[in-house]
Curated annotation (Swiss-Prot):
GO terms for molecular function: histidinol dehydrogenase activity; NAD binding; zinc ion binding. Belongs to the histidinol dehydrogenase family. This is Histidinol dehydrogenase. It holds the Pfam family Histidinol_dh. The keyword Metal-binding applies. It comes from Haemophilus influenzae (strain ATCC 51907 / DSM 11121 / KW20 / Rd). Coiled coil: none annotated. Binds 1 zinc ion per subunit. Its cofactor is Zn(2+). PANTHER family: HISTIDINE BIOSYNTHESIS TRIFUNCTIONAL PROTEIN (PTHR21256:SF2), HISTIDINOL DEHYDROGENASE HDH (PTHR21256).
Amino acid sequence: MQTIIWNHLSETEKRKVIMRPVQQNGKNIQQAVNAIRENVAYNGDRALFELCEKFDGVKLDKLIVSADEIQAASSRISVKLRNAIEQAKTNIEAFHKAQQNQEIDLEIQEGVRCQVVTRPISCVGLYIPGGSAPLFSTVLMLAIPAKIAGCKKIVLCSPPPISDEILYTAHLCGVETIYAIGGAQAVFAMAQGTESVAKVDKIFGPGNAFVTEAKRQVAQNSTAIDMPAGPSEVLVIADESADPEFVASDLLSQAEHGADSQVILVATCETLAKETALAIERQLALLPRAETVRKALNHSRIFIAESLEQAVEISNEYAPEHLIVQTKNARKLLPYLDNAGSIFLGAYSPESMGDYASGTNHVLPTYGYTKTYSSLGLADFSKRMTVQELTPKGFKNLAETVEVMAEAEQLAAHKMAVSVRLAKLNI
């Protein structure tokens, strides 16, 4: 990791050094995803079977995972892992239940009543990546709030063969239907519907560049998505009180997600920065994914800040997905931290806790989107509607205001909708 003293940089250099690595979502990916979209649209299930054999090397005779398969998978989960998943589920449920909306019902002025009511999104689709390290924890993060929100139908797609952990967790969380479908084709199947796959209203979940491009495309049509996605990232703010072994472990735990991940350390102490760099090398030697981690570290940075105030400024400008604060009084910085997907305060709040079991959601905006997007929560699985109801007296008292404004905007029919009612009022 390159070490840079922040105050030695010009303003132009500062902007450049906090830029993310360029995402490889080029024309080739877009063209490949376009072809998949057309194939699924025209050929439905047949396309899904063909693409599964082509990309996953699995020849399926059905797309829906049976109850017997789910039960068999669940029986293979160890008691130790079951207990861990259930503990995480309990914590995540508690935190997301606390997010339930309070209904708003106000009399704005006499005879004018306004409300906000919340309704669940009817049908949601969850995408869970497969591969050598199946993300069953993401099932918890998506299915639990969907269930609490009251979504009527929850379906899940994951590339075959689906791991026992994903099947068990999905069943535990109340997912109704599980499809053995992966990649961009899963996104298009859920967005468009096929003979076997239910059309959904909103799609959630992470994925590779092809899945991300497919989500971008469906979001331009009639299917909503959770948020824009990019490579995973973490920024750590640390002062002289931080333990370099802790800081190193937090940076490495994020770097192991992928070669395109980025990790940033903003330290107020050069000694800590040097000790952390040495700790990274020691710990790296123990990791099975060391090659991937090294690639991520190649475009990662250590910044030396002159103060915690400057460290906060750097963090707010970078706007990380994960922000870890390892300082003497970490909570005191919280009021000044404006842009982050999830914040981890103190030496004993590693990102791993939020990734799995503290209760917060690990589905977070990346690539600087935390300046405008929030971490996933209960609100993402529902929508708000406003309601207004006026009595004749309330209508009359507000009528002139609306007529004047409608006339000023030259919307005569808007004014008329008020005038015809006024003419029939006897109050």
